[in-house]
Design a protein with these regions (language model features):
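ATP-binding glycine-rich loop module of kinase domains
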Residues: 31-86
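Conserved hydrophobic "DFG−1" position in protein kinase catalytic cores
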Residues: 45, 55, 105-108, 190
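Protein kinase-like catalytic core scaffold
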Residues: 51, 88, 104, 179, ...
Length: 214
């Protein structure tokens, strides 16, 4: 595992160094895996594994930052327990440090479901009016005009159906209290038809649309 982690980190760091990700597909083919990369982390997925590997992406250091978003996410999960809303968060676990890089794992999720689509549209609409707007107006603060800066009604309706209105209120308070932003469709998914948020670290980076309050 150590040798594998070192090879992965070396490759990904090199892509960041030269700003060239054209070789990622060759890297994926050589290891028979899928590599995903966003603003803050790398995610490595193997088809035969039931979990994924997450590695903090430190290329932001060229702008003078070195934020470990995986650790922020783990901290946010522990805080969520105090609000009793951790059921909707997909846990992330620190497994060790390899070559000065902290490595985390998270259960593999899906982007689709089979049960949630059966939920009534009335419930989804009721939830949207009472909770959806409050969460985004108070906590998003990032790319408010972007089309992906919203959460699917079916997903939110399933949350309401499973956990109820009080849960939604607690979750809204949780996001506001910790200043959790960057909640949108790209950061949600499903685990055995259970709605989950897979990225709940927020975003404190650079960009014209990020809020200075975060």
């Amino acid at each position: 595992m150590n040798k594998f982690i070192k090879m992965v980190i070396d490759e990904l760091e090199e892509y960041d160094r030269v700003f060239d990700y054209s070789m990622v597909s060759e890297f994926e083919n050589s290891l028979n895996c899928h590599v995903y990369y966003g603003e803050t982390r790398y995610c490595i997925v193997f088809d035969e594994w039931d979990y994924v590997i997450k590695i903090p992406r430190y290329d932001g250091r060229r702008k003078g930052t070195k934020i470990n978003y995986c650790q922020i996410e783990e901290d946010n999960y522990n805080i969520a327990k105090k609000y009793h809303v951790e059921e909707v968060l997909l846990p992330i676990k620190y497994i060790g440090e390899f070559y000065n890089n902290k490595i985390y794992i998270q259960k593999k999720f899906t982007c689709t479901n089979t049960i949630a689509k059966k939920e009534s549209r009335e419930k989804r609409n009721e939830m949207r009016v009472k909770s959806h707007t409050a969460i985004y107006s108070d906590t998003c603060g990032y790319c408010m005009a972007e089309a992906n800066c919203s959460i699917d009604d079916v997903w939110f309706g399933r949350v309401l159906s499973l956990y109820g209105k009080d849960f939604i209120k607690r979750f809204s308070k949780y996001t506001v209290d910790i200043g959790l932003n960057d909640l949108h469709n790209n950061n949600i998914g499903w685990l055995k038809n259970r709605p989950i948020i897979l990225d709940y670290a927020g975003y404190y980076g650079y960009g014209d649309c990020s809020s200075e309050s975060y």
